[in-house]
Amino acid sequence: MYSGAYSFVQISTAAYRISITRLEKTMESLQQQVAQLLEQQPTLLPAAMAEQLNVTEFDIVHALPEEMVAVVDGSHAQTILESLPEWGPVTTIMTIAGSIFEVKAPFPKGKVARGYYNLMGRDGELHGHLKLENISHVALVSKPFMGRESHYFGFFTAQGENAFKIYLGRDEKRELIPEQVARFKAMQQQHKQ
């Protein structure tokens, strides 16, 4: 009786290992495809790459070269958001049904109430209610945008969809704010360890 159960466990363990191996090979293949796209079309955004390769935007971001991204568990989303109000102006972007909404302002302070992280922006700043339990990953991405250095926080759902992005701010000359870049890179490095 026990030998049958033991055999089942062995078969289940073997099947699990095969599944993990297939997943690793698929990820490796996606990393190769992403590297090839980056080489051929360096200005292509992760969302466009995802569309071309028929995967989620998170799959693409997760497959970016290690020097371009740090991915953290969504449980860190609130901590990251709570740090942003002191960074100064940023650009928050939401893409909904093909439309792109942008808010260029300091990221507002927030507090948790009634199941949401509630943003309390001043006039002209972002307001809203974020369902942080729906954020499964946060990616700290460093990828040029329109030929210029660019860095952003991408907040992703369990389905791999991008909920919103927060890009580092730029000054009146359209240059990144050096203090923000330094903080971002330090945070990115911290989460790679």
UniProtKB/Swiss-Prot annotation:
Pfam assignment, any one: ChuX_HutX
SUPFAM superfamilies attached to this UniProt entry: Heme iron utilization protein-like
CDD domains (UniProt xref): ChuX_HutX-like (cd16829)
The entry's keywords: Cytoplasm, Heme, Iron, Metal-binding
Record-listed heme binding positions: Y116
GO CC, any one term: cytoplasm
Location within or outside the cell: Cytoplasm
Molecular function terms from GO: metal ion binding
Domain of life: Bacteria
Keyword tRNA-binding: no
Database matches in InterPro entries: Heme_Transport_Util_sf (IPR053733), HutX-like (IPR010413)
NCBIfam families (UniProt xref): HutX
Subunit-structure text: Homodimer. Interacts with HutZ.
Function, as annotated: Binds heme. Heme is transferred to the heme-degrading enzyme HutZ via a specific protein-protein interaction.
Annotated protein name in UniProt: Intracellular heme transport protein HutX
Lineage, uppermost ranks: Bacteria, Pseudomonadati, Pseudomonadota, Gammaproteobacteria, Vibrionales
